[in-house]
Regions:
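Electropositive polyanion-binding surfaces
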Residues: 4-236
Length: 236
């Protein structure tokens, strides 16, 4: 049943694997033909987008697990546990506002993904929801690409990669090549050995370019939001 798939998948991730589901707001700026902002809306998660997202995550995880089980090096997407100092800072802020206390606070500072998810669920639907999500999200490490599998903390996944996504990354292509070679019985081909020799550098480059492109996207959006605000202010 496709309609219940996202709910069943999400329930399995939270209850059995301890995944974390951050609920943040993402703005989308609509531009006219001249590149001027004409509208700003908040992207909302719908049943359709949840279905696509969960299917994509499952495909990525299945491919990563297959390659990892076969001992294949590729561009794995790795997310490490949060740094203790970052969690302590987040806990201090949430405690001062009376949002976390007792044993839950102790579990959160150890990096328990279940505790983080519980704090997020407690804040859901309250005025503090967006703030709590932001504080805990900023305490997380940034996910990176590595040539070896080391799991994905936030997803609770033993292995993860970018195999399919709305945008085609170079990391996706590295995974496609590795998967095709494995399925064709050519995992030890000359081409794959050549890729393997430079894989660590390729992963570092993919991680760095992602940081740069994400920063450029945020800066561009801020500029357009400021332009839109300026236009509205001049009209008033």
């Amino acid at each position: 049943d496709l309609h219940s798939f996202p709910t069943r998948r999400s329930s399995d991730l939270h209850s059995h694997r301890g995944s974390i589901d951050f609920n943040t707001k993402e703005a989308k700026v609509t531009l006219d033909e001249q590149g001027r902002p004409i509208d700003i809306i908040v992207r909302r998660r719908t049943r359709a987008t949840s279905l696509i997202e969960e299917a994509m995550l499952l495909a990525n995880e299945c491919v990563a697990q297959l390659l990892s089980d076969a001992g294949i090096e590729t561009a794995y997407r790795v997310h490490e546990r949060p740094a203790p100092d970052e969690l302590k800072d987040a806990l201090r802020i949430l405690r001062e506002l009376g949002l976390v206390e007792g044993s839950l606070a102790g579990a959160l500072v150890t990096g328990s993904s279940a505790a983080i998810q519980e704090v997020l669920e407690d804040a859901a639907g309250t005025p503090a929801e967006l703030f709590v999500n932001t504080v805990l999200l900023r305490a997380q490490r940034r996910a990176i690409y590595l040539p070896h599998n080391d799991g994905h903390y936030a997803l609770g996944a033993r292995a993860y990669c970018h195999f399919t996504s709305p945008i085609r990354r170079y990391a996706d292509l590295l995974v496609h090549r590795a998967l095709k070679a494995q399925l064709d019985g050519n995992a030890d081909s000359r081409e794959q050995r050549e890729i393997g020799r430079s894989l660590a550098q390729l992963c570092r480059s993919c991680s760095e370019r992602e940081r740069v492109s994400d920063g450029a996207a945020r800066d561009s959006q801020r500029v357009k939001i400021a332009e839109d605000y300026g236009d509205r202010k001049s009209v008033v």
